[in-house]
């Protein structure tokens, strides 16, 4: 709404009021990771590595077969959205691996 004027008609009629600020409901937090959860998942990933379907999907991503990787992951996980999320996660892992390899190579040459 616009600026409040002292008019009896129109959108700006009535008293000037401030909106109440409510605390967000707990359901709004769904999907947000806590520090502990993120730590535990990272630890498990470090210890267990990747599942066989994730390794195959990463191989497909390495040779730029993104659509094929998505179809493959979608078949394994069940939904399109989960497939897209997993594909993005695995492509981020590949980028991180490339960065780590480049950094390691750079430090060895010095």
From Swiss-Prot:
GO molecular function: structural constituent of ribosome
Record has Cytoplasm as a keyword: yes
Compartments where found: Cytoplasm, Cytosol; Cytoplasm
Annotated function: Component of the large ribosomal subunit.
A Pfam entry, by short name: Ribosomal_L36e
Record's keyword annotation contains Ribonucleoprotein: yes
Annotated PANTHER family: 60S RIBOSOMAL PROTEIN L36 (PTHR10114)
Region feature Disordered, mapped onto this chain: 13-34
Gene3D superfamilies named among the record's database cross-references: 60S ribosomal protein L36 (1.10.10.1760)
Subunit structure: Component of the large ribosomal subunit.
Species for this entry: Ixodes scapularis
Protein name, per record: Large ribosomal subunit protein eL36
Family: Belongs to the eukaryotic ribosomal protein eL36 family.
Coiled coil regions, renumbered to chain: none
Cellular component terms per the entry's GO annotation: cytosolic large ribosomal subunit
Comp. bias (Basic residues): 25-34
InterPro entries: Ribosomal_eL36 (IPR000509), Ribosomal_eL36_sf (IPR038097)
GO BP terms: cytoplasmic translation
